[in-house]
């Protein structure tokens, strides 16, 4: 069987952009120095069934304070929670079959950017094409 999970990236990006208008959201690091940023990454995982595939959505939320390095944790955690709620509320919208929070939000640090951020992983079940 040569199926592959359908790509939910358009649905996710469009939905989160509408749900969180106060943040810059993208699959690459959004360029913004004035608003919180959300970097998304989607990784394919095992096939749950012959007609569905797991995917992991990683959401990194950067909400820097005035110094540009320390994180506004309440803001970052609130945005992470909004991301999780949107995905759980829309987990039956095709090509999604289901979604669950696998871990997070966790407080962590980006050594390259020298910024703290909130990190969440959501396990998605996606239709196979």
Regions flagged by a language model, labelled:
Residues 33-43:
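A short, hydrophobic beta-strand-centered structural micro-motif
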Residues 1-23, 42-129:
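Charged, amphipathic alpha-helical segments and their flanking helix caps
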């Amino acid at each position: 069987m040569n199926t592959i999970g359908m790509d939910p990236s358009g649905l996710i990006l469009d939905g989160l952009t509408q749900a969180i208008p106060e943040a810059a959201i993208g699959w690459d690091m959004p360029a913004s120095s004035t608003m919180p940023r959300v970097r998304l990454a989607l990784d394919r995982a095992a096939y749950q069934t012959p007609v569905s595939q797991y995917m992991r959505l990683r959401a990194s939320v950067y909400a820097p304070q005035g110094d540009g390095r320390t994180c506004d944790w309440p803001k970052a955690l609130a945005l992470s929670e909004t991301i999780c709620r949107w995905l759980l509320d829309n987990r039956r919208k095709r090509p999604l079959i289901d979604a669950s929070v696998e871990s997070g939000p966790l407080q962590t640090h980006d050594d390259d950017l020298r910024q703290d951020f909130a990190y969440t992983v959501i396990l998605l079940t996606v239709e196979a094409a």
